[in-house]
Regions:
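Intrinsic disorder/low-complexity signature
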Residues: 16, 49-51, 136, 145
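Generic cytosolic/nucleocytoplasmic N-terminal low-complexity/intrinsically disordered segments
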Residues: 23, 45, 52, 67, ...
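An N-terminal, globular interaction/scaffold subdomain
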Residues: 29-98
């Protein structure tokens, strides 16, 4: 009599793993204003005029797969409205969060927000050019990254790393994909 119950339990666990194995959602905080507080774009969607096209497109490139979507919130020029942007993100299901740029005090606010979300059971992680002091903070510390002769600072490249991780299935080692996608130059 116990076997059907075990079989059902295995099916439930397998479905849970399958659900988690697919592509993920990127959260992107931009230092800009826009007519809407939040914008959701899937791979292939047109980036509206007035939105940082480069950051959004980099977040949607993905890895082995493309991310499910990118949820963009606007934090005002110079991140003056970062608190409101983070509050807007609270109701969204995001897996990897990135800033495009930074301002004084903003990285710590994002780190604190991510920790709060984790305490509430959400599985969000942040990719930042900021010292990682928590398992949910991924420190992208490469000062400059060059892609197709375009040079990016670490802050500018964090959306790309978020998209890469969001598009990497759990069956694949993320570091392996990273080295396949990028050439790392050391001085």
């Amino acid at each position: 009599m116990g076997m059907p119950q075990i079989s059902i339990r295995f099916s439930e666990l397998a479905k849970s793993v399958t659900d988690r194995a697919g592509s993920k959602t990127v959260g992107l905080i931009l230092a800009a204003t826009y007519k809407e507080k939040i914008l959701k774009l899937a791979p292939g969607d047109k980036v509206p005029t007035g939105v940082d096209k480069n950051a959004v497109e980099m977040s949607l490139i993905g890895g082995e797969q493309k991310p499910k979507r990118t949820v963009i919130v606007f934090a005002g020029e110079g991140f003056t409205e970062i608190d409101a942007a983070l509050e807007t993100l609270e109701s969204e299901q995001i897996d990897y969060l990135a800033l495009s740029g930074t301002a004084e005090g903003v990285p710590q606010k994002v780190v604190d927000w991510v920790k709060e979300q984790r305490d509430q059971g959400k599985n969000v992680k942040a990719i930042m050019n900021y010292a990682a002091d928590h398992e949910a903070i991924i420190n992208y510390a490469t000062e400059k990254t060059t892609v197709d002769s375009t040079e990016y600072t670490a802050d500018q490249f964090c959306p790309r790393i978020a998209g890469l991780l969001a598009g990497t299935p759990i069956t694949m080692l993320q570091l392996t994909l990273f080295f396949r996608k990028f050439k790392i130059a050391q001085e």
